[in-house]
């Protein structure tokens, strides 16, 4: 499978690329503003992608692929231009290039606007809300939106809860495994999926989505 990872030098994106690189059957295109930071691997092709560019330029830079995993974010620095508008431009480019599978890394509560004011991440959630809404209502992509709880840098347990929240955190390791599993198993299409650390092995949890 040919998979594009957007945000390939971020915490989650880098983890996704590293895991995919271990599967010789996958051809990975790792997109980032600074592709030189992406570790070399036989089946990983880094490419430059700046979400501040025009949509046509983003489209021209996108390789031919079967799926996109979108993990990019501005870290709160440029929410409208990157987390919202940048994401929408990638969706538009994907449609024009007929890359129909699109897995979006979002956040818990991104589609619950009545709760935004109570969150310390209010502005981030607003940006994610409109990006997610665009993906659902303004594209024909085979999307999946993953809504994990807080991301933590610890070794993944390999066990999760999908479709509900059982804890307040997720290891980045587990999130990367779920994103990959959603793509490789064609699971959760046209679904918004809640995620937290849990008790079910990731392959089993993903299989139950089909």
Name every feature range the model reports, one short phrase each.
Residues 12, 68, 146, 175-179, ...:
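Non-catalytic, hydrophobic alpha-helical segments
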Residues 3-23:
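N-terminal Rossmann NAD(P)H-binding glycine-rich loop of SDR-like oxidoreductase domains
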Residues 33-89, 93-96, 183-187:
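NAD(P)H-binding glycine-rich loop region in Rossmannoid oxidoreductase-like domains
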Residues 29, 34-35, 76, 82-133, ...:
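Conserved Rossmann-fold NAD(P)-dependent oxidoreductase catalytic core, especially the SDR/UDP-sugar
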Residues 192-200:
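Short-chain dehydrogenase/reductase
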Residues 117-118, 122, 126, 150-173:
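SDR active-site lid
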Residues 154-160, 182-191:
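Glycine/proline-rich active-site loop of Rossmann-fold NAD(P)-dependent oxidoreductases
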Residues 86, 167-181, 191:
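Substrate-positioning beta->alpha
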